[in-house]
Amino acid sequence: MNRSRAIVQRGRVLPPPAPLDTTNLAGRRTLQGRAKMASVPVYCLCRLPYDVTRFMIECDMCQDWFHGSCVGVEEEKAADIDLYHCPNCEVLHGPSIMKKRRGSSKGHDTHKGKPVKTGSPTFVRELRSRTFDSSDEVILKPTGNQLTVEFLEENSFSVPILVLKKDGLGMTLPSPSFTVRDVEHYVGSDKEIDVIDVTRQADCKMKLGDFVKYYYSGKREKVLNVISLEFSDTRLSNLVETPKIVRKLSWVENLWPEECVFERPNVQKYCLMSVRDSYTDFHIDFGGTSVWYHVLKGEKIFYLIRPTNANLTLFECWSSSSNQNEMFFGDQVDKCYKCSVKQGQTLFIPTGWIHAVLTPVDCLAFGGNFLHSLNIEMQLKAYEIEKRLSTADLFRFPNFETICWYVGKHILDIFRGLRENRRHPASYLVHGGKALNLAFRAWTRKEALPDHEDEIPETVRTVQLIKDLAREIRLVEDIFQQNVGKTSNIFGLQRIFPAGSIPLTRPAHSTSVSMSRLSLPSKNGSKKKGLKPKELFKKAERKGKESSALGPAGQLSYNLMDTYSHQALKTGSFQKAKFNITGACLNDSDDDSPDLDLDGNESPLALLMSNGSTKRVKSLSKSRRTKIAKKVDKARLMAEQVMEDEFDLDSDDELQIDERLGKEKATLIIRPKFPRKLPRAKPCSDPNRVREPGEVEFDIEEDYTTDEDMVEGVEGKLGNGSGAGGILDLLKASRQVGGPDYAALTEAPASPSTQEAIQGMLCMANLQSSSSSPATSSLQAWWTGGQDRSSGSSSSGLGTVSNSPASQRTPGKRPIKRPAYWRTESEEEEENASLDEQDSLGACFKDAEYIYPSLESDDDDPALKSRPKKKKNSDDAPWSPKARVTPTLPKQDRPVREGTRVASIETGLAAAAAKLAQQELQKAQKKKYIKKKPLLKEVEQPRPQDSNLSLTVPAPTVAATPQLVTSSSPLPPPEPKQEALSGSLADHEYTARPNAFGMAQANRSTTPMAPGVFLTQRRPSVGSQSNQAGQGKRPKKGLATAKQRLGRILKIHRNGKLLL
C-alpha cells in the first residue's frame, strides 16, 4: 500500500475519502463554502481540496475529514484514538475518546493464550535471550584489499561477507563523531521520511526534524526506526561513497543509460537511524538486491537464513499468512545464523538471503542496495516472489524490468566479444543469461505483454534480443561440453584451493589446510566426516594442475592421479610422495576410512594444520597401495563415462572393450565423438592481459584433433610411445593429401573428413583426367580395398583381452596374431596380399586406421589385376565417380526387411529376365562357334542351392572371364570358389550387375547402384578388345558387354531411368 495515501481512523488504515455531499453538512459551513464545494470538493478547516500527500483523519461525529497538521493530530498517535472529535464537534460532544488499556503491554503480551506480537518489548527480550547458530559457519571474513571482483567470482558471492575494517574497501564515510543532527543538517529538517513503528510493525510518515526531536528526547513513548532514508539527491551524498566493489558490480552504476526516459533507480545510499530495541522482521531486499551495511555508531545484530528452495517456499507462505506478526520465521527453518556487526565493521549480504535486524543500542549506519550479474537467477526469483505477494510498488526495486533489458543487451555484447576474441565467459554469466532469456520470454508472451510493456525500453528490440541471446548461449554451452574433461575446472569458478598469499580469518576449529584462502567450515568441525578415498581421488582429478606448493615445510601438493595410476601402470610400484589432503579428510580417518590400512613401519608424513597443530599420516604399505591403484584405475575409467549423456553416439562403433583392467571385469567404455575444429580452452598466454569481469582466464584455440585424440589424454600414457592419430600426424596427412602446393598455404589445414569431401568434389570435377599414372591408380585401388581391411580387423579384434603393448595401444583395432600352424590357407593368402598392397603404397601417409592417398589415384592400374581375388566387405568405402560397377556377392545372412520390395520393379525384372533367357538360348543355337555352347548351357542351368529363389538372372558372358584374364595377366593362385550370380533378387535389386570384363573389381568394395551414374558409364576395356579379336566377329554397337545388353533388354534409358 502506498504510505503517502494512508488515512487513519481509529488506528485503522483507510482508502482516500470519496467526494462529500455538501448538502448534508452541518450549519457551521457558510453559503459561500457550499457554493465553492459544489464545484470542487474541499475538506478540513482550511477548506482545501484533497491532497494525497497529507495525512487526514475523519471525525466520528460530523463525518468530515481533517488534515492532521490542521487539527494537531500526529499520524503515529492516531492509532491510540478510539473516537475522534474535530474542533467544531469538541464543543458539543467533548474531547476525543482514547483507547482504554486493560493493563501494561507486558501483561497483555504474556496473557495466557495470547501469542507474543512481533516487535513488542516481550518479543525483543525473548529474542535477546535465545541462542542461534554462529554465523562463523557460513560467512567469509576477507580484508578490504582481498574483496575484489575476482574474489567474488571465485566464491560466487553466495554467502555473507564481513569486513572487520573499512581499510581497502575504497569507500568514503563521515567520521565516527557524525550524529543524527548532522544528518538533519545535510538533508533538511523538512524532508518527509518513512518511519517504522516497531511495536505495531507499521509504517508512518514523519518529517526528519520531528524524528530528530524524538531521537534526542529523554522519554520515548514508542520505538521508531528509520531504515529507508535515501539521500542520493541531497548534500549528504557528497560525504558518503559506496564501496569500490559495489561500484564495479552495480547494474545501475554501470549499465543505466544517461539518456533513458525512465527515472534512474536511486537505491545506492541509505541512512539508517535506529533507537534501542528497534527490530525489522524477516525480509528479502527488494528485487533480490544485495545489500551492504556499515555501522558508523552503535551495533546491529543480523539473523540470516540461507535462500534454499525450501526456505524460500516457507518464507512465501509465512509472508502471506494472516498471523505473520505472531510467528517467528527463524523457528520454521533448519538453520538461522546470528551475526553481530559492531562499530566500524561492514557486512555484505548476497542475493536472496532472508534476514532480520535487531538494534541492541542506538545506532547510526549507512548502507545501500545493488543488482549485479553474479546471481541473476536468484534476483529474478526474488522478484517473482514479490509479485506473487502483491508487494506495493513503494517497496519494490524501481524499474526492475527495465534494467534487466539493458543487462540482457549487455550480456549479449559480452558473449559476442569474448567469442570473437576466442575467450570464454564465466559460468555464472552463462547461467544468468539463460535465466534472463527465460524471463524475457515470459514477459513478452501475448497474454503477459500488457503488464510488462511499460517497462520495455524503446531502444531494445525484444524479439531479436531473445533470439540472439539464445543463440550465443547455445554456442557457449557447446564449447563448455567440448571442454568438459579436457581442462581442469575452466568454467566452474569454485576452486578447491584458490590462489592467494593472505589467509582469511576463520574459526579456530576449522581444520582446512593453511594454504586455502577460503573455507566454509561446518558448525562442529569434529563431527564433519572425512572424504572417502574414492571421493578424494575424484577431487584430485578434477583439480588437475591447479594445485600449487603449500609451503617450504615439506608440504607439497601432488596430483594423486599421476601418483597412483601412472606409476602403477608403468612400473607396478609406487614412489614416495607427499599429498595435499584437507583437514576434513584427516578427521576421524580411522573410523571413516577403514580401507586405508597403515603400516607402522613406514615413515610418517607431517601436515601442518591451520590451527597450528600437526597430524602425521603414515604411508601406505606396498600391498595396500597395489589394491588402491586398482581402485583408482577403475574410478578413472568410470569417470570417462560422465560424458556419455552429454553427446549423442553415432553408431555402435564407438563401443570398445577397454583392455587395461587385465583380469578384472572388462568395462564398456563409451568414447564420445567430438566435432572437429571446435574452440578449445587453453591457459591465457599473455600474463599482462587484464581479465574482464565475467571472463575466465583462458583462451580458445582451434582444435584439429580426430576422435581418437579426444581420448588420447586418458589412455595415451598406457601405450609405449603410440602416437598414431595425433595432431602432428594429421597435419602431415593433410600435406600429403593436399599436394605439393598445400604447404605454402598460410591457413591451418582442414580435418581429414574435410579433405575427404574435397577429394570427392575434385574427383567429380575431373572425371576424364584422373587415369594418369599407374602408381597413383594403384594407390586409389588400395584405398578402395583398404577400408574393408580395417573394418574386418576391428571386428576380429573386438572382444579380445590382451595385455600386450600393441593391444594397449589401440584396443580392438588389431587382428589377432596366430601361430603358423593355426593359420588357414586363406589367411596366409590374405596376409601376403596385404603385404604386397602396403609395399605398393610407397610414401603415401597412413596411420592406425586410415590411409591418405593423393588425388591422382586411379583404379586402372594393371598391376592390381595380377593380385588374387578375395572377398571384400567394405560397405563404408567412399563413393568414386570413376569406379566401375562391381558384382555384388551374395550375403546369405543379411536380413531382408519386410515391405521394402517394390512390386512393379520385381515384375519388370522377372519379365526382363525371362525374355533375356529366351534370347540367349536363341543366340546360342545360331552361333558358329560350338566351343562356347557347353559353357552357355552350364550357365543357363540353375544351381541346386538356388532352386528355392524366386528369380535367377543369368549372365552368359561371365563364363568367359577366366579366358579373358589369361590374356592380360597370369593365372592367380587357386582360391575358394566364388559365385557371382547366386543369391536372391534382393541381392541384385538395388545394386549394379556383374561385369565380365573387370577382374580387378573383386578387390573393390560393394558399390550401390545409382541410376544415371553407374549404368550409363561406358569405358573401353582392354579385355573386351582382345576378346573380340580372338573371336573374329565384332559385336553390334552398344551390345559389346553384358551390362549394355542387359540395359537394352531392360529398356534402361541413357539418363538412368528404368522404363517399365
UniProtKB/Swiss-Prot annotation:
Localization terms from the record: Nucleus; Nucleus, Nucleolus
Gene Ontology terms, MF aspect: chromatin binding; histone demethylase activity; histone H3K27me2/H3K27me3 demethylase activity; histone H3K36 demethylase activity; histone H3K36me/H3K36me2 demethylase activity; histone H3K4me3 reader activity; histone H3K9 demethylase activity; histone H3K9me/H3K9me2 demethylase activity
Major place of residence: nucleus
Cofactor dependence: Fe(2+)
Catalytic activity: N(6),N(6)-dimethyl-L-lysyl(36)-[histone H3] + 2 2-oxoglutarate + 2 O2 = L-lysyl(36)-[histone H3] + 2 formaldehyde + 2 succinate + 2 CO2; N(6),N(6)-dimethyl-L-lysyl(9)-[histone H3] + 2 2-oxoglutarate + 2 O2 = L-lysyl(9)-[histone H3] + 2 formaldehyde + 2 succinate + 2 CO2
Region of interest (Disordered), ranges: 100-120, 508-534, 768-840, 852-902, 915-1046
Sequence positions bearing Phosphotyrosine: Y704
Cofactor note (record): Binds 1 Fe(2+) ion per subunit.
Residues bearing PTM Phosphothreonine: T705, T706
Biased composition regions of type Low complexity, renumbered to the chain: 769-778, 785-804
Effect of F315S: In MRXSSD; abolishes histone methyltransferase activity; reduces transcriptional activation activity
Documented EC number(s): 1.14.11.27, 1.14.11.65
Any Pfam family: JmjC
One annotated Gene Ontology cellular component of this protein: nucleoplasm
Family according to the record: Belongs to the JHDM1 histone demethylase family. JHDM1D subfamily.
UniProt-recorded name of the protein: Histone lysine demethylase PHF8
Organism: Homo sapiens (Human)
